[in-house]
Amino acid sequence: MQAFVQFLGSNPYILLFLTIGLAVWVGKFSIKGYGLGAVAAAIVVGCLVATVGAAYGVKFHLDEFAKSLLYYLFMYGVGLRVGPSFVNALNKESINYAILAIIAPILGLAIVVLGTQFFGLPLGAAGGMLAGSQTMSAAIGSAEQAVSAGVLSLGSESPEQISAMIALSYGITYIWGTVGIILLCKYLPRIWGVDAKAAALEFEKAHGVPNVDDAGLTAFHPFDLRAYRVENPESIGKTVQQFRTRFPQYQVVNVERGDQLLGPSAETVLQQGDVVALGGRLEEMTANMGVLGPEVPDARALNIPLDQAEILVTNKEVTGRPLKTFRGSELAGQIQLQRVERSGVPLPIGLETTLQKRDVLFVTGLQPAVSKAGEIFGVIARHSSATDLLTLSFGMILGFLIGLIEVPAFGAKVGLGNAGGLLLSGIIVSSISSRLRFFGNTPNAARNILEDLGLIGFVAIVGINAGADLLTQLTGAIALKIFIVGFLASTIPPIIVWAIGFHIMKINPALLMGATAGARSHSGPAREAAKEVGSSVPWLGFPVGYAVSGVLLTVFGYFAMVLAH
């Protein structure tokens, strides 16, 4: 064992990725659905590895440059993810959710700062408690930035000791921070005496929102494509345009005459024996089965090339409109809306689902219809797995330049720093690229690498570097005080957010369950809330708060450190 520990001490890259791998493995374990997750496991595993090393006389220490670089990549990735929704939060439809997402982080920060001062907790505790109680691991990074930026008076304590206290406080408060918000989002309606299931059902009926979580894979398709042989005298001799005028609910997508495929030209005259591929809603297809003639299994006529695309909603004329207003459009029967995403979060698709700018529509249909849909709704973004590294590089440079900007305030110079600058530049780049879609492509998988590897790697290094000093910081009295402050910071803000949303903003309780989860930037409670009410409605209240609170909580680790001392 001694030789293995010394080997790790001599090979820091192996040490780092061993810690990351073990953290991901440990993070997969759960008890009744509750587990640490990879990020929390990274700091636990990192501290454990460092403690084992110290027991054998080897003090592990990984490079500060690598730690900072990983964190900066993560911050830029966060900006890319939340950018469009963060901008969307400024519109009037989303303002209530944005307000709730501002209230919760501020309350959490205030409780942590006051609790630290009341109990006289050591440096580093405030940053760790904020990160753990709000389950925002990224706040560890901004807390560390407060130490490295030199804005704190360290006194006799070393940066390693402060990092150890950040890690310790995070670990003590994280478990209740995770479990508590899930329990609150599930049971706050019951505490208030509200039937959230009935509220969700009422919203579904009023807005046509299906329970997509339970939909699964079914054989039902609302749109259909069938082939008919022209034998009805009323249709023989009519042009395709005349047929469309008489039956606007159908779309002629192909005409086969003998060995020729004539396509859906409006001027084509239908002749006896032609085979017409007809598209439309299923109920319409079965209502007038003899309008052309008998149905035939003509594979050649039905062999219609289909297209798939992601359409970014940018057209002002369609934003704010519910989906039901498009039912009678020329696209009916030619495209199928498979999914709607807002800030990367899938939304339930219902007749009253209202489109917002920068929503992404995933459609499948006839090639001309998909192109037409792109013109109507905004911009077609063809799927690409290639990452625009040029934009990524210049986006990172922009972030570092923003971080250099400092303004005089309160007798000192204040700026966003590198981390804040990268977060802001990520928001700017993703907001612009989501509008144009001609540059800056960063597929979800690539962005996930920036976020996951960046944060897990950063937290692992924090744990490794702090672990040797961890045991010297730990006493029963300090641990109890940290837990109390973390418990209050995790529990009080969601209750106040719920009360404001329910009594003042009059938000539907099912939506408010998701909004409360979003205000804590945690998807787990929204998922559990959806299960609790048996509906997807809570997800509709989630995306805006998730984006806003995610940005605030990420940077509040810095302010917790500064304000608490």
From Swiss-Prot:
Gene3D superfamilies: Regulator of K+ conductance, C-terminal domain
GO biological process: potassium ion transport
Places the protein is found: Cell membrane
Transmembrane feature ranges: 4-26, 33-55, 68-90, 97-119, 162-184, 389-411, 415-432, 453-472, 482-504, 539-561
Domain annotation RCK C-terminal: ranges: 210-295, 296-379
Key words, A-Z: Cell membrane, Membrane, Repeat, Transmembrane, Transmembrane helix, Transport
This protein's record includes keyword Transcription: no
MF term (GO), any: monoatomic cation transmembrane transporter activity
Membrane topology: Multi-pass membrane protein
GO cellular component labels: plasma membrane
Domain of life: Bacteria
Major site of localization recorded for this protein: membrane
SUPFAM superfamilies from the UniProt entry: TrkA C-terminal domain-like
One Pfam short name: TrkA_C
Family: Belongs to the AAE transporter (TC 2.A.81) family.
This protein's name: Uncharacterized transporter BB2657
Organism: Bordetella bronchiseptica (strain ATCC BAA-588 / NCTC 13252 / RB50) (Alcaligenes bronchisepticus)
